[in-house]
UniProtKB/Swiss-Prot annotation:
GO cellular component, one term: mitochondrial inner membrane
Annotated TM spans: 26-46, 60-80
Subunit relationships: Associates with cytochrome c oxidase (COX, complex IV); proposed complex component. Also associates with respiratory chain supercomplexes.
Topology term for the membrane: Multi-pass membrane protein
Organism: Homo sapiens
Name of the gene: HIGD1A
Name this polypeptide is given: HIG1 domain family member 1A, mitochondrial
Length: 93
């Protein structure tokens, strides 16, 4: 009885750096969304000291909503870009 399933694996393994670069080229708005999320959270934490008389919970909720809105916007633009690439920019055979 043979245990060979007929699946062949590539003879090389892709390191994490090249895999990240390849994935960023396939979906360019994912790194943009992650970077925007990190920037908004960093800015919100920086402005935490000068929030005035706003409650901490309200400030954190506003920061979370802004970060999530940026990520959803980046996902929407990325989806539109990939649809454009696939349906309109693709040459007709």
């Amino acid at each position: 009885m043979s245990t060979d399933t007929g699946v062949s694996l590539p003879s090389y393994e892709e390191d994490q750096g090249s895999k990240l670069i390849r994935k960023a080229k396939e979906a360019p708005f994912v790194p943009v969304g992650i970077a925007g999320f990190a920037a908004i959270v960093a800015y919100g934490l920086y402005k935490l000291k000068s929030r005035g008389n706003t409650k901490m919970s309200i400030h954190l909720i506003h920061m979370r909503v802004a970060a999530q809105g940026f990520v959803v916007g980046a996902m929407t633009v990325g989806m539109g870009y990939s649809m454009y690439r696939e349906f309109w920019a693709k040459p007709k055979p």
